[in-house]
């Protein structure tokens, strides 16, 4: 597919047939190999291959490993369908199936009750997003009489503003669920109960990016809805800040990385909110590699422990036992922190700068929020490195007795290390070549050459300064008492408790009332019970009349 794109140097559409034809509504079945699809399909293919190679060793002792490889391969097929489809309906098929496969992979270790609960939570929250996607599809078919990207792009300028705002809101809600934005984000942390290769592929590099991909693919709608773009901006800003605050007090190594994924997805959402779609996709492109590497490095640490603990407080001193894993996590963390010279610096900081370069009140405020988030990213990245690899061992001797590196897991990690270092240097070629199909938005060029140096360097300076303070705290001031703020963040701002107490419990109570007073009450009286009693009553009346006539 990449070869076709480079040969023709323009979008290539492969028409496979007509799927649905009802009057003037024609829904095609085909593939669209444009710049956007080709940019996203590259990390999907490379990381899927690396994860499958990594899983050979990681899952080598699992009796159900063949089923795992089959499900993971099927996921790659449907993720590809989601990306290269030429219409929203085909995209929705891929969207649905990656959600179902995510459920199967999170619950892969089905004997763990926590894994089953987490999988159920993940699929239910994702189904909420799917519902909004279905409604958006219905509106497109009703008003556009089409769901293919080209037709929608051509007709959108003539559509009603209210309809476009409604479509933008529905697609945003769908993306909020899939890309774990604030409000529908709880499933991503719970998804860490699945095997680590699943986290590296689905919950870092591919599936969770589907929401961002849908928003970028829907740029032709969003560009006519400035109100929705502002909402998207603020949603991304709040999510990136909240996820960073929660991450600095989280002790589960995979959950910290999941929260960093949530934060980086929010940076992409921020870019979409200022119409910098090319920057959003480029950050998605780069982020996939170093985030998959982070998960693989964490998996190497977890796999080497006898009890496979994920609590960083039980680690310590592992740099002596796992030097390669330390190097891999260090490179990925520095890239995540946007240290100059590494991939993350070239894709992440330009988005933060562009917020300031938008020259709007919201842009200025969100710039400082994003700077705060970038600072928190540096803090929790360093915290992972310190608690895991530095200091003294915190587990018992037996846990350290069999720790070793695995060559089978190292080889795919080496590939991702190379990408995490060097892929950032391709920014100009990716933005200049791949983004041809996106709206003409050259704001980042003005940002690059007009902003003062301190605006550009502020995230880096704050991140390094507060990281140094964090090292001092861990070394010399570790007896600081836990505060109410710590407990608030450690409980993930009590989101799950609020959701359970206000939404879930009241919904169940409403369901109970509906069952008692409608299903078992009104409907039962008018339905089965009422009919039964009526028949019995009629039979009695008939018998009485017959007896009366007989005696007469």
Curated annotation (Swiss-Prot):
It is an enzyme of class 7 (translocase). GO terms for biological process: electron transport coupled proton transport; mitochondrial electron transport, NADH to ubiquinone. GO terms for molecular function: NADH dehydrogenase (ubiquinone) activity. One of its GO terms (cellular component) is mitochondrial inner membrane. It is found in: Mitochondrion inner membrane. InterPro entries: NADHpl_OxRdtase_5_subgr, ND/Mrp_TM, NU5C-like, Proton_antipo_N. It catalyses: a ubiquinone + NADH + 5 H(+)(in) = a ubiquinol + NAD(+) + 4 H(+)(out). The chain crosses the membrane at residues 11-31, 36-56, 68-88, 89-109, 121-141, 152-172, 196-216, 229-249, 256-274, 287-307, 322-342, 365-386, 406-426, 453-473, 532-552. It is a multi-pass membrane protein. Pfam families: Proton_antipo_M, Proton_antipo_N. It comes from the Eukaryota. Its main location: mitochondrion. Its EC number is 7.1.1.2. Keywords: Electron transport, Membrane, Mitochondrion, Mitochondrion inner membrane, NAD, Respiratory chain, Translocase, Transmembrane, Transmembrane helix, Transport, Ubiquinone. PANTHER family: NADH-UBIQUINONE OXIDOREDUCTASE CHAIN 5. Core subunit of the mitochondrial membrane respiratory chain NADH dehydrogenase (Complex I) that is believed to belong to the minimal assembly required for catalysis. Complex I functions in the transfer of electrons from NADH to the respiratory chain. The immediate electron acceptor for the enzyme is believed to be ubiquinone. Belongs to the complex I subunit 5 family. This is NADH-ubiquinone oxidoreductase chain 5.
